[in-house]
Amino acid sequence: MMAHQHPYYLVEQSPWPLTGAISGLMMNLGLVLWFHTGNIILLFTGLLLLILTLVNWWRDIVREATFQGSHTAIVENGLRYPMILFITSEVCFFFAFFWAFFHSSLAPAVEIGVTWPPSGITPLNPFLVPLLNTAVLLSSGVTITWSHHSILAGNRNEAIQALFLTVVLGIYFTILQAWEYIDAPFTIADSVYGSTFFVATGFHGLHVIIGTTFLLVCLIRLSGHHFSTHHHFGFEAAAWYWHFVDVVWLFLYVCIYWWGS
């Protein structure tokens, strides 16, 4: 490798952006094919290629950051701004769902009986599973902060325990959400209420799964001594993302589950 008189890391050629784009195309085409013909093979093939891309791309980044020392302090500082912009874009993403919800609920149309929830819709009790899910996510926010402070204090064992609890709570939340969907007395096809409910909470559930995956990778890396008190941006980025997921859920609970019911 040629020496460069600057502190920035120049990435090497990688096949993963191309395979990631191909997997995205395959999943989109596979989804359409599944809807129209019931054939799910292309969708699952694209998903498998996406997982393969993520695993290998993650492996390369871990190698560059941890074993090759390519992520200097200046490089890490440069990674913080894209992560902040990414979370900001996610805020805008969920803002659209809240806009659709309030547009439909504050002035209900005559087609749904000029009432909210619409006529014939039995909303979920916000003080049962949704309240438990709120407690689970708030608890996970506490444990991820506990893990972060343990890393800063150099207490690796405590950091691993706290991060493990966070991953368990994330999985538990996903199980509860799936159970709630199965038992829900309405579907995504039941008026604008069902559409906004399942799209907003469903995309949040997807973000919880993604965040849990991030934290699981961080747990593996933490167990492998990849993080130190001064070099753990991968964990910090995952923690930021998890706190964002927590905050979005609080808005979902208050607006859709409690006020919307």
From Swiss-Prot:
A Pfam family matched in the record: COX3
A Gene Ontology molecular function term of the record: cytochrome-c oxidase activity
PROSITE patterns in alphabetical order: COX3
InterPro entries: Cyt_c/ubiquinol_Oxase_su3 (IPR024791), Cyt_c_oxase_su3_dom (IPR033945), Cyt_c_oxidase-like_su3 (IPR000298), Cyt_c_oxidase_su3-like_sf (IPR035973), Cyt_c_oxidase_su3_a-hlx (IPR013833)
Subcellular location: Mitochondrion inner membrane
EC number(s) given by UniProt: 7.1.1.9
GO CC terms in record: mitochondrial inner membrane
Record keywords, A-Z: Membrane, Mitochondrion, Mitochondrion inner membrane, Translocase, Transmembrane, Transmembrane helix
Signal sequence region: none
Topology class, membrane: Multi-pass membrane protein
Presence of the UniProt keyword Transit peptide in the record: no
Top-level taxon of origin: Eukaryota
Family named by the database record: Belongs to the cytochrome c oxidase subunit 3 family.
PANTHER family membership: CYTOCHROME C OXIDASE SUBUNIT 3, CYTOCHROME C OXIDASE SUBUNIT III
Record function comment: Component of the cytochrome c oxidase, the last enzyme in the mitochondrial electron transport chain which drives oxidative phosphorylation. The respiratory chain contains 3 multisubunit complexes succinate dehydrogenase (complex II, CII), ubiquinol-cytochrome c oxidoreductase (cytochrome b-c1 complex, complex III, CIII) and cytochrome c oxidase (complex IV, CIV), that cooperate to transfer electrons derived from NADH and succinate to molecular oxygen, creating an electrochemical gradient over the inner membrane that drives transmembrane transport and the ATP synthase.
Assembly: Component of the cytochrome c oxidase (complex IV, CIV), a multisubunit enzyme composed of a catalytic core of 3 subunits and several supernumerary subunits. The complex exists as a monomer or a dimer and forms supercomplexes (SCs) in the inner mitochondrial membrane with ubiquinol-cytochrome c oxidoreductase (cytochrome b-c1 complex, complex III, CIII).
Descriptive protein name: Cytochrome c oxidase subunit 3
